[in-house]
């Protein structure tokens, strides 16, 4: 039995209907869009979590009806993912020896590459570019500003 409230179900239905509308109005949402759908509902799943819950990389492999999306949403929302931003902020603070909210650009890059989903040096560069991150005269960055900009998203997808 579902633990979702009527409001939650209605919210999922609205987002589902929007995705269905873009996808041909056939009552289905492609499994490749599951991550995007969850993100529209305020979640921040990793690609790995999306795939664990039935998301696919390629369009056309699988599709879901609303009744099949609800349990995915419910399971994902019940997992307290403790936000990724909190995890990154804690990691950044360990490098902030003087407690001034600043760490070196190199240390930020290391944290970005080690925590969460592994990213490449190029992806780090993209993050710095899209977030308009600039180092101070000592090569340091205000990591709280970086996190605010990253969490605000969205970023251009260069993988297409």
From Swiss-Prot:
Top-level division of the source organism's lineage: Eukaryota
InterPro entries the record matches: CALM/Myosin/TropC-like (IPR050230), EF-hand-dom_pair (IPR011992), EF_hand_dom (IPR002048)
Blocked amino end (Xaa), modified sites: 1
Location of the EF-hand domain: 7-44, 83-118, 119-153
Pfam families the UniProt entry points to: EF-hand_6
UniProt keyword annotations, A-Z: Motor protein, Muscle protein, Myosin, Repeat
Annotated disulfide bonds: none
UniProt-listed Gene3D superfamilies: EF-hand
Transcription listed as a keyword: no
GO molecular function, a single term: calcium ion binding
Cellular component aspect of the GO annotation: muscle myosin complex
Record bears the keyword Nuclease: no
Protein task: In molluscan muscle, calcium regulation is associated with myosin rather than with actin. Muscle myosin contains two types of light chains: the catalytic light chain, essential for ATPase activity, and the regulatory light chain, a calcium-binding protein responsible for Ca(2+) dependent binding and Ca(2+) dependent Mg-ATPase activity.
PANTHER family: MYOSIN LIGHT CHAIN 1, 3 (PTHR23048), MYOSIN LIGHT CHAIN ALKALI (PTHR23048:SF33)
Name of the protein in its database record: Myosin catalytic light chain LC-1, mantle muscle
Lineage, top ranks: Eukaryota, Metazoa, Spiralia, Lophotrochozoa, Mollusca
């Amino acid at each position: 039995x579902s633990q979702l409230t009527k409001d939650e179900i209605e919210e999922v239905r609205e987002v589902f209907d929007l995705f269905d509308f873009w996808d041909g109005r056939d009552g289905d949402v492609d499994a490749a869009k599951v991550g995007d759908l969850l993100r529209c509902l305020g979640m921040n799943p990793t690609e790995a979590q999306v795939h664990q819950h039935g998301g696919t990389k390629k369009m056309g492999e699988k599709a879901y009806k609303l009744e099949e999306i609800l349990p995915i949403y419910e399971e994902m929302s019940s997992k307290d993912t403790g936000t990724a931003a909190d995890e990154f902020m804690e990691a950044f603070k360990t490098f902030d020896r003087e407690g001034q909210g600043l760490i070196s650009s190199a240390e930020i890059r290391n944290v970005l590459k080690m925590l969460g989903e592994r990213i490449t040096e190029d992806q780090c560069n993209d993050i710095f570019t899209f977030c308009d991150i600039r180092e101070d005269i000592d090569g340091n960055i205000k990591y709280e500003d970086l996190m605010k900009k990253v969490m605000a998203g969205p970023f251009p997808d260069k993988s297409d």
